[in-house]
Every structure is written in C-alpha cells, then in structure tokens.
C-alpha cells in the first residue's frame, strides 16, 4: 500500500474531521516522511509497512475519537526551529508562545523570568533569541521542570530552573529581574473541553481562583517591584477588555499571534504608572497598597499617601517628622473646633494650620477637592528628596532614575492647576506663631485676619 492509498483509506474513516489532512501529514513527519501538501503526497509512490499503518491508525483513533492531544501521542512538538519533548501531565507548548517572545524589547534587559514555565517553551525561545540573557524558569511542578531541562538540552541553551510556586521564586532568585514572560493558568473550569482534560488542571486553572486572579497579582507585582522593566503575558480574548483596562495605567499594548489573533499583552514598567485624577477608585486602591501619588497641587508638586512611613522612605527623611493632613471640604466637620471656626476664611487655600501638633490644609483646586472628597484624608508633602527642591513638571519625575524606581504613581489632571512652586504658609494655632511664610504670604494672611476681625 502506498502512503497516499493509506491516506485515502483513513480519510474515509474520519471524513467529517476538518483537520484530518494536517494531522495526517504531522504524523507522517514524525516518522520521517516530509510532505508539505497532500498533492506532494499524491505524487509520491512511497510504500508504507503494515506495522506502521497499525501505529498510525491507533494514533488517529486516539486523536479523533478519544481526543488525546497529538503532541502527547507523538512525544514531541516542533515550533518553528525549536523542538520540545512532551509528556502527559505537563502543559503542551503552543506556537503562540513564539509570538509572545517576538514582541519582547531587549533594550536594557539583562535578566528574564519565565513564570509558570511548564516544559520551558518561553524561557528556551527567549534564550534562543538572545544568548547573553540570564534566563530563569520557575514552576511548582517538578515533572514539568525535569522535562524543561531536557528541552533546554535538546535546543542547546542554558537556563536556571527553579522549583517554586508562583511568586515564591523571587525568594530564590538573588538578582533583580528585568523581564517577566508568562503564560499563567487563566481558564475557568467551565472552559475545559475534552482535549484539555488530558492536560494538568493546575496549568489551566489558577489555584481554584477566578481567571482574573493571576493577572491582578501580576499588576500588583509591577507596582511593588519597580526593578521589573517589562511584563509579557498570554491571556484569552474574553479577558482582553478587562485586562487592557487594568493595565491602562502603564504603557501597554495587545499582542497578536501570527494569524493576527489577540493572544496577550505587553506592559512597559520603565516609567511610573499614570492615573487620571478623576479615576478616584484606582487612586484609592493604589494608596491602600502602600504607594504614594505625585500630584500637582495649588502650591508645589505634592506627594500624597495614607502612610507617613511611606513618605519618609521615599523622601529619605528623618523619622517622626509630621506631615500635613490634606483633605476635601467634606472632612471639615471632623476637625478641632478652632479649625472649623476659621476654615471658611482661609480654606480652600494655601494655608496650613497646626493644632495639637497636627497639620491641616484644604487645597484651592476643584480637581484636588473632588479627589480628596472621594479618597478621604491623606498625608501630603512636597514631592522631593529631603533637602532638594521638587520638580515643576510631572514629566520630570518620569525622567528621573531615582523616582521611577520608587513605589509611586503619577496623578494626571486635564485641568490646569495653578501652582506657584511656593510652599503653603504654616501657622501654629497653639503657639500663635508663623512657622513658615514669605513676605507676600504674611501680608495676605494679616489682611484676611484684619478683614474678618479674627483673634487667632
């Protein structure tokens, strides 16, 4: 029997299967028969042994009837110029992984991590792309790591393999990671079909969590590990809009495979995240995570946080120094009575008052007032390192190597904030003394006191 006659024989058995031709040619290739098209197979007069026909019949049955993935049946899969061994119980490499790696920008990248590496597809493809990279691959599955080691040998690359669950790998990696590439478990249990039933569930569904969980953790990781310059991940089309929205505070873009289908995202973390001042929900979430926001106030560039210790670390400032509490008008009722009495005469405005050793101010800007009404009271200080002056433009912080490594984000306002780059006047109500002021501020301050006949 010729190969083509055998093809026709099996075609009749599986004629309802649209992918039969491709599957048949792939199996033939596994046994050393190289035919790119059925036409070339037809022109061939090569014979096939009965022993081999029995093997191929069994493989076709397992694939089309029992829905066992072809790479498991053949024991290998070819992705362009890369060869990977496969094994039941270990996630099968996909061609889309190469599209992810094709999107990598290697500028300033020295170290890379394939998170949830499985059989090592992304790590190996990345090392092949740039041999000078220091590449790590981590996975919780020891069987997957053993297979990854074999695949690295097959493809003649050296990778650092780590057995670790998810972010635990960072405890074992002693060098900062510049790039993370990952194809994390992102499916719902309801999305598992018969073919996927043969693949390990932990590679498909993330720790019995929802399909969004892994990406939310990756989002948080970029915010807290500022050394990570780039994140590239695979996800499903159903998650596209939600993830584009989640990562919109970073410079990010979608990734498409070689068939122009959406398969994932590329996120640049080399600049500080940017959040619109009207996006109060996100700003509040980031502040709750322990980050600080850089915002243009009515006086200077300000740094706001829910935590005084966060501000201390960023500003490299001596501990136990107090910061100004800044808030919206809705918070006035919670202030000491003395402050409430004079509030309407000076606030909103560039006046800071100290009462009971605590400092308070309400800014004179509608955007800031709306923000603070939504997120509540924050600690505020000038956005500068101790003994240095703050910048006058938000963009300056994005070009400063110190600031882009800090746990900060930019709060962007479309309206023009009237900032004069002069700190607010500070008056201590307890000691009745001006603590900080300029000649111009002092004149205006006393003018208001006289006008309203205030006894402060």
Curated annotation (Swiss-Prot):
GO molecular function: double-stranded RNA binding; protein-glutamine N-methyltransferase activity
InterPro entries in alphabetical order: DHBP_synth_RibB-like_a/b_dom (IPR017945), DNA_methylase_N6_adenine_CS (IPR002052), N5-glutamine_MTase (IPR050320), SAM-dependent_MTases_sf (IPR029063), Small_mtfrase_dom (IPR007848), Sua5-like_dom (IPR006070)
Stated name of the protein: Uncharacterized protein MG259
Positions in coiled-coil regions: none
Alphabetical GO biological process terms: methylation; translational termination
CDD domains associated with the record: AdoMet_MTases (cd02440)
Lineage of origin: Bacteria, Bacillati, Mycoplasmatota, Mycoplasmoidales, Mycoplasmoidaceae
Taxonomy, superkingdom: Bacteria
Record-linked SUPFAM superfamilies: S-adenosyl-L-methionine-dependent methyltransferases, YrdC/RibB
YrdC-like domain residues: 277-440
A Pfam family this chain is assigned to: Sua5_yciO_yrdC
């Amino acid at each position: 029997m010729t190969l083509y006659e055998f093809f026709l024989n099996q075609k009749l058995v599986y004629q309802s299967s649209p992918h039969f031709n491709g599957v048949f040619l792939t199996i033939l290739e596994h046994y050393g028969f190289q035919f790119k098209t059925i036409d070339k197979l037809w022109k061939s007069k090569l014979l096939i042994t009965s022993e081999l026909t029995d093997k191929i019949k069994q493989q076709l049955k397992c694939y089309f009837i029992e829905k066992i993935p072809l790479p498991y049946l053949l024991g290998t899969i070819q992705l362009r110029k890369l060869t990977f061994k496969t094994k039941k119980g270990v996630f099968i490499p996909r061609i889309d992984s190469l599209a992810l790696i094709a999107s990598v920008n290697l500028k300033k990248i020295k170290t890379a991590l394939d998170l949830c590496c499985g059989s090592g597809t992304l790590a190996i493809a990345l090392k092949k792309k740039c041999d000078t990279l220091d590449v790590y691959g981590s996975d919780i599955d020891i069987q997957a790591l053993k297979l990854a080691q074999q695949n690295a040998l097959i493809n003649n690359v050296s990778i650092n393999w780590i057995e670790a669950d998810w972010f635990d790998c960072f405890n074992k990696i002693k060098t900062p990671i510049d790039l993370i590439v990952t194809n994390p478990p992102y499916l719902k249990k309801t999305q598992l079909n018969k073919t996927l039933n043969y693949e390990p569930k932990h590679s498909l569904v993330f720790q019995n969590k929802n399909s969004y969980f892994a990406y939310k953790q990756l989002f948080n990781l970029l915010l807290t590990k500022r050394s990570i310059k780039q994140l590239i991940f695979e996800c499903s089309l159903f998650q596209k809009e939600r993830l584009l929205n989640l990562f919109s505070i970073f410079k990010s873009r979608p990734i498409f495979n070689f068939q122009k289908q959406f398969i994932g995202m590329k996120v640049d973390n080399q600049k500080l995240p940017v959040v619109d001042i009207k996006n109060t929900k996100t700003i509040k979430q980031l502040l709750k995570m322990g980050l600080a926001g850089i915002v243009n106030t009515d006086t200077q560039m300000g740094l706001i946080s829910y935590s005084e210790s966060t501000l201390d670390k960023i500003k490299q400032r001596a501990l136990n120094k107090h910061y100004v509490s800044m808030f919206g008008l809705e918070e006035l009722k919670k202030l000491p009575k003395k402050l409430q009495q004079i509030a309407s005469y000076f606030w909103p405005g560039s006046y800071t008052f100290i009462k009971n050793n605590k400092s308070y101010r309400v800014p004179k800007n509608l955007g800031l007032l709306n923000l603070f009404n939504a997120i509540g009271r924050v600690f505020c200080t000038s956005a500068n390192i101790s003994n240095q002056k703050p910048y006058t433009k938000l963009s300056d912080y994005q070009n400063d190597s110190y600031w882009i490594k800090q746990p900060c984000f930019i709060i962007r306002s479309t309206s023009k904030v009237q900032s004069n780059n002069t700190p607010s006047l500070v008056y201590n109500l307890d000691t009745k003394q001006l603590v900080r002021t300029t000649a111009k501020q002092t004149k205006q301050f006393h003018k208001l006191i006289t006008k309203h006949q205030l006894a402060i």
